[in-house]
Amino acid sequence: MIASSIKAAVVKDNARQPGDTGSPEVQVALLTARINELMPHFKTHAKDHHGRRGLLRMVSRRRKLLDYLKSKDAERYIALIAKLGLRK
């Protein structure tokens, strides 16, 4: 679980306007922060399949949100993936 201070910083950095917590950009950024925090755990605990299922669920949800954002506003999608470094 990410700390509330880190979560607040992620929301502040990706909010479209003050108080924005539900936009796709914020949701994707929060999921990315949680995914990045979990990755070292799976490097050391390779057989944690139950936890991996939760990780894959988060990755899938992030992918769906990104697909939604891409269909609604491609410019915001491109800016977000560049900001978060999701595509190479």
UniProtKB/Swiss-Prot annotation:
Pfam families: Ribosomal_S15 (PF00312)
PROSITE patterns per record: RIBOSOMAL_S15
Transmembrane spans: none
A single MF term (Gene Ontology): structural constituent of ribosome
A Gene Ontology term for the protein's cellular component: cytosolic small ribosomal subunit
Subunit field text: Part of the 30S ribosomal subunit. Forms a bridge to the 50S subunit in the 70S ribosome, contacting the 23S rRNA.
Protein name (database record): Small ribosomal subunit protein uS15
Source organism (scientific name): Albidiferax ferrireducens (strain ATCC BAA-621 / DSM 15236 / T118)
Gene behind this protein: rpsO
